[in-house]
């Protein structure tokens, strides 16, 4: 079974990239979709991602970091020309569904670039008091108007909404162009959801077919996330075809690389 990690970041520490590739090899992860969120998150920037992809073009898929309210549609176009295949969105200056941001979503739809939206509470390692960062701007239901206005746009809810699982699940169920990943730290929101049972939220037939595998952890935790995800699928007797969608088929379809 092919495995592609659809949610990974490149931290700005020595040898992180080589450690990441080694962790991917250990877990039989074929490729990962990688973004750099810059100094605020102790990551490399988009230029650093470009350089990483040049080193490992067959292992890395570039996701350009776009901050709504700071970056523009032209930045998306430039990234597309540079070979980026998808977009990573977080910490907007206004809610995701603000009309001022619609040119971003229109450009992404035109270029057929899937968007991975952070949803829920956000952890920022570097505190900047002048920054007004609000998780309320990143509520999963902020994506509803976007999914309606741009029906050909491919949206991924990161972290299943973190603490807004009810809303994330309903959007997932009701909108054909919305998917989710279950990424996050082992001791974070995933632990709560698994203690209850994720079928509380993914209750309808075919719900698991809209999941995309992603980790969003440091390289040393990737194997743990993968094992937890497989254990969860085993618990609910998820069939092999659905597993193929989760671990590679969905993201490849969204990237139009099937």
Regions inferred by a protein language model and the residue ranges of each:
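Mid-to-C-terminal alpha-helical segments outside catalytic/metal-binding sites
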Residues: 1-9, 15-31, 35, 77-78, ...
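A generic "structured core" feature
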Residues: 2-4, 104, 116, 146-149, ...
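Active-site neighborhood of phospho(di)ester-bond hydrolases with catalytic His/Asp-centered motifs
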Residues: 3-6, 33-36, 63-64, 88, ...
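Conserved, mostly hydrophobic/aromatic
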Residues: 7, 24, 49, 79, ...
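Short active-site segment of divalent metal-dependent hydrolases/proteases
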Residues: 10-11, 121, 162, 219
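Short, acidic/polar
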Residues: 13-24, 44, 68-79, 165, ...
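Active-site gating/metal-coordination segments in enzymes
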Residues: 39, 43-132, 136-137, 178, ...
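Catalytic pocket-lining loop regions of alpha/beta-barrel enzymes
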Residues: 86, 101-212
């Amino acid at each position: 079974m092919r495995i592609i990690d659809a949610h990974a970041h490149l931290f700005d520490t020595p040898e992180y990239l080589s450690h990441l590739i080694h962790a991917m090899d250990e877990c039989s992860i074929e490729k990962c979709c990688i973004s750099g969120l810059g100094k605020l998150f102790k990551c490399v920037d988009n230029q650093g991602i470009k350089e990483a992809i040049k080193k490992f073009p067959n292992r890395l898929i570039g996701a350009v970091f776009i901050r709504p309210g700071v970056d523009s549609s032209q930045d998306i176009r430039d990234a597309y020309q540079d070979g980026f295949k998808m977009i990573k969105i977080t910490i907007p200056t206004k809610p995701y569904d603000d009309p001022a941001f619609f040119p971003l979503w229109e450009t992404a739809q035109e270029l057929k670039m899937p968007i991975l939206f952070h949803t829920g509470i956000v952890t920022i390692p570097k505190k900047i008091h002048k920054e007004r960062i609000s998780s309320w701007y990143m509520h999963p239901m902020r994506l509803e108007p976007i999914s309606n206005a741009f029906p050909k746009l491919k949206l991924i809810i990161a972290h299943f909404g973190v603490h807004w699982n009810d809303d994330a699940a309903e959007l997932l169920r009701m909108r054909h162009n919305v998917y989710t990943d279950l990424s996050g730290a082992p001791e974070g929101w995933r632990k709560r959801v698994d203690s209850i049972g994720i079928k509380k939220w993914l209750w309808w037939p075919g719900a698991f077919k809209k999941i995309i595998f992603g980790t969003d952890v440091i390289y040393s935790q990737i194997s743990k996330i993968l094992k937890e995800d497989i254990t969860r699928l085993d618990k609910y007797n998820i069939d092999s075809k659905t597993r193929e969608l989760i671990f590679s088929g969905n993201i490849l379809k969204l990237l139009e690389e099937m």
